[in-house]
Amino acid sequence: MLCFERRLPSDTPADLEMAFTFEQRERSRLRFPLPDGREAAFLIERGAPLVEGERLGTAEGLVLAIQAKPELLMEVRTSDPLTLVRAAYHLGNRHVRLEIGAHWLRLPPDYVLRDMLMRLGVEVFEVTAPYQPESGAYGGGHHHSHSHHEGDEFHSKPRLHHFGGSQ
């Protein structure tokens, strides 16, 4: 299995490109099939989701370009900026991860949130688009190890999450 373990500069020429959903890009360990059928995984530090255009490398020198896979989302719009800010406030109060544009908010589909948003006076549309929510005010990550031994990164053996095929 090929292990993509190193983050590389985004201008590093890529040998292949693959698209992942935000949920997949948020994981620090993920097993996946390459287009040619070989098994691969990324094994990266926790706390920093992969973003569109990022590059990962293997010890063998193979470089993977990360793409954000389009996914079904709710897009919140209104012509009134204050109403949009109110909607963002109420979603934030519920710890909903948001992608914020100049005139819209995007979030994963949720019928309860859709009803709340409609009551606030915004329009809610279904869109299919790449999803890259805000990372949060504090940088979004729990970066230290709980190990008491220098060099031990994991308390227990890391688990790989699977997608696209048999486990």
UniProtKB/Swiss-Prot annotation:
Record lineage: Bacteria, Pseudomonadati, Pseudomonadota, Gammaproteobacteria, Chromatiales
Purpose of the protein: Involved in urease metallocenter assembly. Binds nickel. Probably functions as a nickel donor during metallocenter assembly.
Encoding gene (name): ureE
GO MF, one annotated term: unfolded protein binding
Organism per entry: Nitrosococcus oceani (strain ATCC 19707 / BCRC 17464 / JCM 30415 / NCIMB 11848 / C-107)
Record localization: Cytoplasm
A biological-process GO annotation: protein-containing complex assembly
NCBIfam families for this protein: PRK13261.1-1
Protein name in UniProt: Urease accessory protein UreE
Domain of life: Bacteria
Keywords on record: Chaperone, Cytoplasm, Nickel, Nickel insertion
Region entry Disordered, spans: 135-167
Gene Ontology CC annotation, any one: cytoplasm
Disulfide bond entries: none
Record-stated family: Belongs to the UreE family.
Ranges annotated as biased composition (Basic residues): 157-167
